[in-house]
Design a protein with these regions (language model features):
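Acyl-donor (CoA/ACP) binding surface of acyl/acetyltransferases
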Residues: 1-28, 63-175
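Proline-rich intrinsically disordered, low-complexity coils
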Residues: 12-13, 38-40, 57, 67
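Conserved GNAT-fold acetyl-CoA-binding loop/helix
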Residues: 29-51
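A generic membrane alpha-helix/interface feature
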Residues: 45-47, 53, 136, 159
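A short helix-loop-beta-strand connector motif used in the catalytic cores of GNAT acetyltransferases and
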Residues: 50-61
Length: 175
């Protein structure tokens, strides 16, 4: 499965992408709010992650068309077809922040989720301190729904974080 936007291709990662993934996520500014990403992050970690990701059809590398390289990841987890809901997760390499890439990737994933998968609800959580992630979610239409205390532990730092819960209904957006 590939999702194509103006500047991006969202596609499953392959073992050839391991070095690009390491280059972008082996950075505490990126990994400090991620529950499952260690720091430092090695090629071995990337290969393990890629092999797991290949079993999940809804986990995508964010590929910059201009270079053909993976610069981040985005995907769905805890997908429940009965209640038509999934959780969104993402990260983006630091040098790509502030360029609208996260917005473009997230909008593409939303469109895929609501149109192709026929989901009714997407949800996301972000560390209270991660204002950029909260702002991204709000920018694309997610609504802040609550606070979960000590709901996430970042693997890279071992630190517990309170998280905000966000939700988005299909009826909230025009696709």
């Amino acid at each position: 499965m590939r999702i194509v936007t103006e500047r991006l291709i969202l596609r499953p990662p392959t073992l050839k992408d391991a070095a690009d993934i390491v280059e972008n996520v082996n950075n505490l500014k990126v990994s400090r709010y991620l529950a499952l990403v260690p720091y430092p992050y090695s090629i071995k970690d990337a290969r393990f992650f890629i092999k797991l990701s290949q079993k999940d059809p809804h986990n995508f590398g964010i590929v910059l068309k201009q270079t053909g390289k993976i610069i981040g990841m985005i995907g769905l987890r805890n997908l429940n077809y009965f209640v038509k809901r999934a959780e969104v997760g993402y990260w983006l390499g630091e040098k790509y922040w502030g360029q609208g890439i996260g917005t473009e990737a997230l909008r593409a994933l939303m469109k895929y989720s609501f149109r192709n998968l026929k989901l009714v609800r997407l949800q996301a959580g972000t560390a209270v301190e991660n204002k950029a992630s909260a702002n991204l979610l709000k920018k694309v239409g997610f609504k802040k729904e609550g606070l979960r205390r000590k709901a996430m532990r970042a693997k890279s730092t071992g630190k517990w974080h309170d998280t905000y819960s966000f939700g988005l209904l299909r009826s909230d957006v025009k696709l």
